[in-house]
């Protein structure tokens, strides 16, 4: 791995460490993906607890629940046990 890649990885790990609560992951990380009642077709990410991975789904743009993230990285930092 190049030194630039290593620095990027270390930076991401630091961000995850700052964003991840020490106690445990947030309870909404176990909720199923909810597209909501609207039909805007935006791509978002949700935490899939059985696989401990963040997966993409289509969000309608309104409503839904809190297990919804704009980026995979934010989802992993918030919900994954091992980001």
UniProtKB/Swiss-Prot annotation:
Molecular function via GO: potassium channel regulator activity; serine-type endopeptidase inhibitor activity; toxin activity
Signal peptide: 1-24
Keywords: Disulfide bond, Ion channel impairing toxin, Neurotoxin, Potassium channel impairing toxin, Presynaptic neurotoxin, Secreted, Signal, Toxin, Voltage-gated potassium channel impairing toxin
Subcellular location: Secreted
Pfam families membership: Kunitz_BPTI (PF00014)
Highest taxon of the lineage: Eukaryota
Expression tissues: Expressed by the venom gland.
Disulfides per UniProt: 29-79, 38-62, 54-75
Domain BPTI/Kunitz inhibitor: 29-79
Gene3D superfamilies per UniProt: Pancreatic trypsin inhibitor Kunitz domain
Family to which the UniProt record says this protein belongs: Belongs to the venom Kunitz-type family.
Subunit-structure text: Heterodimer; disulfide-linked. The A chains have phospholipase A2 activity and the B chains show homology with the basic protease inhibitors.
Physiological role: Beta-bungarotoxins are presynaptic neurotoxins of the venom. The B chain is homologous to venom basic protease inhibitors but has no protease inhibitor activity and blocks voltage-gated potassium channels (Kv).
PANTHER family (alphabetical): BPTI_KUNITZ INHIBITOR DOMAIN-CONTAINING PROTEIN, KUNITZ-TYPE PROTEASE INHIBITOR-RELATED
Protein name, as recorded: Kunitz-type serine protease inhibitor homolog beta-bungarotoxin B6 chain
Organism listed in the record: Bungarus multicinctus
Lineage: Eukaryota, Metazoa, Chordata, Craniata, Vertebrata
């Amino acid at each position: 791995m190049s030194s630039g890649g290593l620095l990027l990885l270390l930076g991401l790990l630091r961000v995850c460490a700052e964003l991840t609560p020490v106690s445990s992951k947030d309870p909404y990380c176990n909720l199923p993906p909810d597209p909501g009642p609207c039909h805007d077709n935006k791509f978002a990410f949700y935490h899939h607890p059985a696989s401990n991975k963040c997966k993409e789904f289509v969000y309608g743009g309104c409503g839904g629940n809190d297990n919804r993230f704009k980026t995979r990285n934010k989802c992993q930092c918030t919900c994954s046990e091992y980001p």
